[in-house]
């Protein structure tokens, strides 16, 4: 499968999303390794809290997908599962996430996969459209500025955008030179 969902009961107080995460990361990886071999995404839920990551993502980096599209209000609680399914798992969006929004850093010591968060996804697409709209000769040549709070994943957002600039609309972007300057 390309995604694994592990659900825990919302009415049992002794089961949590952490239990769901442990089941995927320890039991499934140990007992059913072929299940996770080509799995890109994993979702954990206790009915009220739903989060997404990869089979390599530490629990603290699982996140909620709180919007179906960038114009909607944030949803949470019981509606969070429906929002995640509509927002991250619609056919077109799921293909986009798998193709452009999962990053596997080079690391010999452990397996790592960075999966986009919904603000990164929407920001990268919005910037892509803005860059296309401002290309010369019809536009002013300015791509714009992206501002994000500390810890919001700006570097990954720009990495995802760079991947799209380099691989999509080759007729428009014509082999762009991309320079990313980070402060670390």
Where are these regions (language model features)?
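ATP-dependent helicase/translocase motor core
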Residues: 1-182
């Amino acid at each position: 499968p390309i995604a694994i969902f592990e659900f825990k009961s919302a009415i049992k107080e002794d089961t949590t999303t952490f239990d769901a995460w442990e089941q995927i990361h320890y039991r499934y990886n140990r007992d059913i390794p072929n299940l996770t071999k080509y799995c890109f995404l994993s979702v954990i839920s206790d009915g009220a809290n739903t989060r997404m990551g990869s089979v390599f993502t530490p629990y603290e980096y699982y996140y909620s997908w709180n919007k179906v599209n960038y114009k909607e209000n944030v949803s949470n609680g019981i509606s969070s599962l429906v929002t995640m399914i509509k927002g991250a798992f619609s056919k077109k969006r799921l293909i986009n996430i798998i193709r452009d929004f999962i990053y596997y850093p080079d690391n010999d010591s452990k397996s790592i996969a960075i999966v986009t968060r919904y603000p990164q996804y929407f920001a990268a697409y919005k910037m892509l459209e803005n860059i296309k709209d401002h290309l010369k000769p019809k536009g002013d040549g300015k791509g714009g500025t992206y501002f994000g709070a500390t810890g919001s994943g700006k570097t990954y957002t720009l990495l995802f955008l760079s991947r799209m600039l380099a691989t999509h609309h080759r007729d428009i972007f014509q082999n762009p030179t991309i320079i990313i300057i980070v402060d670390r």
